[in-house]
Curated annotation (Swiss-Prot):
Chief place where the protein resides: membrane
Protein's organism: Danio rerio
Residue pairs linked by disulfide bridges in the UniProt entry: none
Keyword Glycoprotein listed: yes
Family the UniProt entry places it in: Belongs to the pecanex family.
A single cellular component GO annotation: membrane
Sugar attachment sites: N383, N1173, N1200
Spans traversing the lipid bilayer: 40-60, 70-90, 141-161, 172-192, 222-242, 250-270, 272-292, 311-331, 347-367, 398-418, 466-486, 504-524, 592-612
Protein known as: Pecanex-like protein 4
Length: 1225
């Protein structure tokens, strides 16, 4: 797609220009897109102006001196209450008349803006429903009606001309200005009233995707009431407060601008406003942290307010110090982890119960230090006050007595610079990403080498951790304990200040250290000479400094993001639209306005919203740092999610030391990081941070690479390579510069993580080589012998009481026979092989159906699939195999990204429509017997095939019972000629070798030789295994002298052609699964021998098979067992695939090993700004076009990846972890 793709397509543009005027006016739909009778518009216009009319009545009565101010407002409010009741009553009556089913209000129904209504007359039900959709809940009808009356009455009082003249009389404002202010203010009131009582417009500032409880109608009236509340406070104040009067004058002017602010979406919805206000007060007023969930935020906010109130009422300064230190430490912990300990579950990556006594010892030490220093300071200050002669002696000698707080201030400055320097050394980049860290290891490929080269950095990180988490809190507590403002604690500001200060010491030691250092520097630089600065007290100074530091930091980040959008709109050729030059010129000409917008967004801690991600900047509405209303952990799961599920658990343990050592930089709530490993991209968000812990959310982005995804992923790789694998450039001055500085991503660190490494190979020359395929038959027989013998031994040694006919789980799962063996039956020493004459089953028809539909039983196929690209994510389907008893689920289909297996490329498509597949012989019913579909299922005549060996077999060794096989496995109806031809292929030497090895493993060195000799000389046992193994080989279809690649692949998938004994084999489900596993093992052995060389001895073959059984899952990506093996962290996984487009067979191997995951920091304000635009674009403009401009790849801003990482339903991460608690002390 080119850069000039439309921002909104034609359909959406028409939709937007119908919706936006409705938003501006608060609900009237004056542009419908179709013809409507004039009375529809008249109704809406009358209802819109009704509040002004009713308020005018009260105003007129007041101006005529008929009523005073209060009664004038009451009259207007009562009239509005009556009108609102009538309007809502009509709406509910019409809803009842037209039936129980009624359409949703327009604010919640996107289609309501597009429906074409047939109007019959002015009071018809459809007309009333169109003008006044009504409320869903009766409680809202009552609440909104009463609120509309109160709003109209208070607005009448608020906008009385006499009041406006008195408010602005001394400013020289004339009558014209007052009249204009009066008229425009009533327009604002009419907009708020209409959205409350008539019809609610869709707001540009939308936080929740669904307005379930009809909160949106309350947004605009609540802002109006907030403005009125300030004026009421001024009216009822005993003496005119200058600050309130100025505020009222300013708010009266802003009252006129409210419709513009609503239309631009700068004012938060009530739910977002409440959460944002609680978060800001908790962080900057009470010293807490942004919380990971809304419930935690509410509980922590209320608890912190209670602590501040209690601090105000504590009578002594010593009690204040001890109480605030203890409460600060307690609330800076994640107390929910105590519940985890009580439940008996070890906390995530924590110390368990050991953390409690350690924390108790530390807080006791902190309390002791604070109490002693405070008391000593009081004693010393008392002594200095009483002993004035000593002071005069100090002054006469020219030596000023040392101030304890000043000494501690210098110590804090030293700690700050040391910890900051040690933190800078931990990351790959320094000075905000502008330069590369020369001490960070480069071109490291293995985790072992990385650990070896970063040993010195880890020692520095441990030193920093000790200084920051142990020394700094104690020093800061000492600094605050000797503060002179503790003597004036019984003021609200100081009570809040000390509560916050002692909380920040624990909650965010690094931020608290920076703030105290700035306060100390200001004091040393002569801050006492600034008017009223010294009178504020240290703790209030800390509050102001923290706000300034945060807002300045936000301003710098937002300005950097704005410059990135501006510059790349021209420098990136694929982002350069025709309007780019015009927009750049406008931004340059209106540079002061741009800076004002950036400053305002920073001041409000609101996102800077680039409209359609163009250099057109707006102030988004303030919202919590998490940006989304829901609890983290929602995702759009797919089969590929399992890889992130395994990776996230390991990544969380690797993040802990990196966070603690400072490798991630200034890690605060709201920070975002991007992790990269092979084809996987991880989005790491910091949700919450406290003393010694951090709560993170890890998201996995889709593995299927779209074109946009590929462009940005390639740039991410370039950024990481420039930092971690860069080649030294000539010149001492510029060799350390970051070549990708200015990108939204700043490389931070490498993390050793135990993760699956993905390797794909094309099997051309291996799977189609006659030499290799000729060996497959022999390997299969050997593998099947080993599996059957091992199965019997494990049954016997386990001693369980289950029957041998129980279903065995699919190969590779941890519930397979190696983990959950089935016990053997106690049987006699003499085993009789029964002669059976069985009628041929009538189920050949459904076998034909099974064979021919095997490819269409996995998932969906679409003509839009990119056959040359990655595999599309499909919803998994279950494949059912019919047996005589029931239906058995074989597995749940999943697909590994990039896989070219036949089951994932052509899953449910009719094979007749795939002419390229016909030569492969797949699903065409080849080899099946001819049947007459018109006839009923009549039992076929008895078969003439009988068991070749009809004589009873006599075990000569008493230990042969251990290796006996179930009777059902010896009942195959196969022609004796087939088995006689294959009898020489039975590996007798291998059979004897396996017997000796298994006896050695089971019995040890005791009677090993005698038992082994007896078993090897037992011809009945060998005959039994010969018969069963060869029968399985024939039934599976693996008796071909030379396999074709197509037949090998079909047998590997368990979808081979119909054979004479296939029905018998599938009826014995357990034996079928063992046989299939043996064939898959033999295919893996074939691939290994072709790659690594042939197996040279029986002992090597035995060891190889044992390794397969213990450490490998060998099967299909579409098996549910594949997912289970990934979650259970099976060391290796192997699968075959078939690329139909290229005509090649492939292998895929996942190996679990420790690899280096690259992690970089993202511009958090850039992320918030793009998410704000996404919210506006999808929830308001409904611009969900998959090819829209704002979702196109942007290699500098990483726009496509950022949109993917948003919470559903706006984003689409395929995995999102619940909040993960990490202990980082």
């Amino acid at each position: 797609m080119g850069p000039d793709v439309p921002l909104l397509n034609d359909y959406k543009q028409e939709f937007f220009w119908k919706r936006f005027p409705q938003t501006v006016l608060g609900g009237p739909r004056l542009k419908l897109g179709y013809c409507a009778p004039p009375y529809v518009y008249v109704h809406q216009l009358v209802l819109f102006l009704t509040p002004w009319l009713l308020g005018g009545i009260g105003t007129l009565l007041y101006q005529l001196r008929v009523l005073d101010e209060a009664f004038a407002g009451i009259v207007s409010g009562a009239l509005m209450l009556g009108v609102g009741a009538i309007v809502q009553g009509m709406a509910r009556c019409m809803a009842r008349r037209t039936g129980v089913v009624q359409r949703l209000p327009a604010a919640n129904n996107i289609l309501a803006d597009e429906e074409e209504v047939e109007f019959t007359h002015c009071v018809a039900p459809e007309t009333v429903r169109f003008v006044v959709p009504g409320k869903r809940f009766m409680g809202n009808v009552v609440l909104h009606t009463c609120l509309a009356g109160a709003l109209c009455g208070l607005s009448t009082w608020y906008l009385l001309p006499h009041r406006l003249s008195g408010l602005y009389g001394h400013t020289g404002a004339g009558l014209g200005a007052v009249v204009s202010l009066f008229a425009l203010s009533w327009v604002t009131v009419c907009i708020g009233e209409y959205s409350l009582i008539v019809n609610t417009a869709t707001e540009t500032a939308t936080f929740q995707p669904q307005d379930t409880y009809e909160i949106t109608p309350l947004n605009r009236p609540m802002y109006i009431l907030a403005f009125i509340a300030v004026d009421l406070a001024l009216r009822f104040s005993d003496s005119g407060v200058v600050e309130l009067q100025v505020a009222s004058q300013v708010l009266h002017v802003l009252f006129v601008v409210l419709p513009v602010l609503w239309a631009l979406g700068m004012l938060s919805p009530l739910d977002a406003l409440l959460l944002w206000a609680m978060e800001q007060i908790l962080v900057y007023g009470l010293g807490g942290s942004a919380m990971s969930t809304n419930i935690r935020l509410l509980v922590m906010f209320l608890s912190s307010v209670c602590v501040a109130i209690c601090t105000y009422f504590i009578p002594t300064s010593l009690g204040v110090v001890l109480f605030t230190v203890a409460m600060g430490f307690l609330f800076s912990q994640d107390l929910t982890q105590l519940l985890v300990l009580v439940k008996g579950v070890s906390p995530t990556l924590g110390l368990g119960w050991w953390g409690l006594p350690l924390s108790l010892l530390f807080i006791i030490g902190a309390l002791t230090e604070a109490g002693l220093l405070h008391q000593l300071n009081l004693v010393n200050s008392g002594n200095l006050t009483l002993n004035t002669n000593s002071v005069e002696n100090w002054e006469s000698s020219g030596v000023v007595p040392p101030n304890p707080q000043e000494v501690l201030g210098w110590l804090l400055i030293a700690l700050f610079f040391i910890t900051r320097l040690l933190r800078e050394l931990q990351g790959a980049c320094i000075i905000g990403g502008a330069m590369l860290n020369p001490l960070y290891p480069k071109r490291v490929t293995t985790a072992q080498a990385f650990r070896r080269k970063t040993r010195g950095l880890r020692v520095a990180g441990i030193i920093r951790r000790i200084l920051l988490n142990l020394v700094s809190p104690l020093t800061m507590i000492a600094f605050l304990s000797v503060d002179e403002s503790l003597g004036k604690i019984h003021t609200a500001s100081l009570a809040i200040g000390f509560t916050r200060a002692f909380r920040m010491v624990w909650q965010s030691s690094e931020a608290a250290l920076l703030q105290m250092v700035l306060v100390v520097i200001i004091k040393l630089a002569g801050g006492h000479r600034v008017a009223h600065w010294h009178d504020l007290g240290t703790t209030v100074q800390l509050i102001l400094v923290s706000l300034v530091v945060n807002r300045v930091s936000q301003f710098v980040c937002k300005l950097s993001f704005a410059l990135t959008v501006l510059i790349t709109s021209w420098t990136e050729s694929k982002q350069r639209r025709q309007s780019a030059g015009t927009l750049l010129a406008l931004n340059a000409a209106l540079c002061p306005l741009l800076l004002a917008v950036v400053a305002l967004s920073a001041l409000l801690s609101a996102p800077l919203l680039p409209l359609f991600t163009l250099p057109v900047f707006l102030v988004g509405f303030p919202r919590p740092l998490r940006s989304w209303p829901g609890t983290p952990g929602t995702a759009c799961p797919c089969p590929d999610s399992v890889y992130y599920q395994q990776l996230c658990k390991r990544l969380a343990s690797a993040i802990r030391p990196a966070l603690a050592n400072g490798a991630f930089g200034s890690c605060t709530p709201g920070s975002h990081y991007l992790g990269r490993f092979q084809g996987r991209l991880l989005w790491i968000s910091i949700l919450e941070k406290g003393y010694g812990y951090c709560t993170v959310n890890i998201k996995g982005l889709e593995l299927q690479e779209t074109s946009c995804h590929t462009v940005e992923a390639r740039r991410v790789d370039e950024v990481f390579e420039g930092a971690f694998d860069h080649v030294e450039r000539p010149g001492q001055c510029f060799r350390l510069l970051n070549p990708n500085w200015g990108n939204a991503l700043i490389p931070c660190s490498l993390l050793p993580v135990r993760v699956y490494s993905d390797a794909q190979s094309v099997l051309t020359g291996i799977i189609d080589s006659p030499d290799h395929l000729r060996q497959l038959n022999s390997d299969f027989l050997k593998t099947l012998v080993w599996i059957l013998l091992r199965y019997c031994v494990q049954e016997f040694t386990c001693g369980a009481q289950r029957t041998k006919g129980q279903t065995l789980q699919t190969s590779g799962r941890k519930s397979q026979s190696s983990q959950h063996p089935v016990p053997s039956e106690a049987g006699p020493a003499v085993i009789k092989v029964e002669t059976q004459v069985r009628p041929e089953s009538s189920s050949s028809s459904h076998l034909r159906g099974l064979d021919s539909s095997s490819l269409s039983s996995f998932a969906d196929w679409s003509d839009e699939d990119d056959l040359f690209g990655p595999v599309p994510v499909r919803r998994p389907m279950r494949m059912m195999v019919r047996t005589d008893e029931a239906q058995t689920e074989l597995g749940l289909g999943v697909s590994l990204p990039g896989s070219v297996e036949i089951h994932s490329l052509y899953e449910s498509m009719a094979l007749s429509s795939l002419p390229t597949l016909r030569p492969l012989g797949l699903g065409l019913g080849l080899g099946l017997p001819i049947i007459d579909k018109g006839k009923e299922n009549i039992p076929a005549p008895t078969s003439t095939t009988v068991r070749t060996n009809s004589q009873p077999l006599l075990f000569t060794s008493p230990h042969s019972e251990l290796f006996s096989l179930p009777a059902d496995w010896r009942t195959a109806n196969l022609a004796s000629s087939k088995l006689q031809v294959l009898r020489p292929c039975f590996p007798e030497a291998w059979f004897c070798f396996c017997l000796s090895q298994l006896v050695l493993e089971s019995l040890g060195e005791g009677d090993f030789e005698q038992v082994t000799q007896g078993l090897q000389e037992d011809r009945a046992l060998q005959e039994l295994y010969t018969q069963v193994v060869l029968s399985c080989c024939v039934a599976l279809g693996a008796d071909a002298q030379v396999f074709s690649p197509n037949l090998l692949f079909r047998l590997y998938c368990g979808d081979g052609p119909w054979t004479e004994g296939l029905e018998w084999l599938r009826a014995n489900k357990e034996l079928h699964q063992l046989t299939l596993r043996a064939f898959r093992y033999s295919v893996k052995l074939l691939v290994d021998q072709a790659s690594l060389g042939p197996v040279e001895s029986l002992d090597e073959l035995y060891t190889t098979l044992q390794d397969y059984h213990k450490n490998w899952f060998i099967g299909l990506v579409s098996d549910r067992s594949w997912q289970d093996s990934v979650v259970q962290e099976k060391p290796f996984l192997f699968s075959l695939g078939h690329d139909l487009t290229m005509g090649t067979y492939t292998s895929r191997v996942l190996s679990l090993q420790e690899n280096l995951v690259q992690v970089g920091a993202l511009n958090e304000e850039g992320v918030r700004g793009q998410w704000a635009n996404l919210s506006w674009e999808l929830l308001y403009a409904t611009n969900d076009d998959e090819e829209r401009y704002s979702i196109q790849a942007h290699p500098v801003m990483l726009r496509n990846l950022t949109i993917q990482a948003a919470d559903p339903p706006l984003g689409y991460p395929i995995y999102s972890s619940p909040p993960i608690h990490l202990r980082c002390l």
